[in-house]
Amino acid sequence: MAHLLDGHDGKCQNLHGHTYKLQVEISGDLYESGAKKAMVIDFSDLKSIVKKTILDPMDHAFIYDQTSERESQIAALLQKLNSKTFGVPFRTTAEEMARFIFNRLKHDEQLSISAIRLWETPTSFCEYQE
């Protein structure tokens, strides 16, 4: 994903990308019988949900703050060039992105999300939970 932080006083004001790593923590009761006995969720199901809900729309996209005129102008140019964009109504800090991802996933009735950990670099992450 690529983004920028309009108005930031450092290098993050420039368009740049990250190879994010997403960690999803779930909780819930174990299935008592059937193919999923002793599981909260089959990890392949979890992976499919995360792919559909988060990765497919956001991977290799310019993630931009729709409330920023500058970022919206950049997104419009990229859209004219048939580049992938994904608009959100907030500044695209790792903290806000973690909250956004948590909230998108918590609406899936198959999941009971406990926390999201979003790694922006190999040594820096933020976590969101409710």
Language model region names:
Residues M1-E130:
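Charge-rich, low-complexity N-terminal segments
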